[in-house]
Amino acid sequence: EKSDKFDQLLLLIESGIKSIEQMNTIKTINKQLHDKNEELERAYLDTIGILRQTVEAKDPYTRGHSDRVSEYSVLIGKKLGLDEKTLHILKIGGLFHDIGKIGIPDSILLKESKLSDEEYSQIKNHPMIGVHMLGDAAIFTDILPIVKHHHERYDGRGYPSQLVGDDIPYVARIAAVADTFDAMTSKRSYRDSLPIDVVRAEIERCSGTQFDPNIAKVFLDIMDNDFDLIREIQEKYK
């Protein structure tokens, strides 16, 4: 009987050792898969990043735009107390929000005079072009709301979906403020950058119509009390 119990104990020990070995093997495989996935994600991000830079390289007046929008969005997100995952979405979403412009003809994208209605309609296609470009890649799922909806307006008069108020994804509402601020404070082929007091007044005026009023309020507070943070971003991505 003692011998039987001893044999059973040995079997249990052997079984336990095998289980541990199997668990270690599974952990190793999972780590290898995780590392490979990270490599693929980095490669994909690098590829799309090159496309993004290609878009900005076409127009010297918008160079650095996406980098600044990314950092302004994160700055707003931090002031709002958002979690790290959402801040990461804002960062990557800001970088790729205009990726769809790669599908817009240079003759329209670089035009120095006023756009015709037809040309403006084509420009308005860039969010959906971006969604089609990134939509099949799982790593971009979280940023698609920014790519698609950063031109929506709080009052429902934006594009492409004419969403109203809280129906607009929160991260897209943040990116909209960041995007507009950078557009107004950047020199363009058809105008100089706007004075900062004019920009501030415009954001305040559009609070509740173009912008989520709470997000606009937070950004106005940054402009009033932490403008050095904005200036650092502008200096970094001249």
Task: Give the ranges of each region predicted by the language model.
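Metal-dependent catalytic cores of enzymes that make or break cyclic nucleotides
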Residues: 38, 45, 49-238
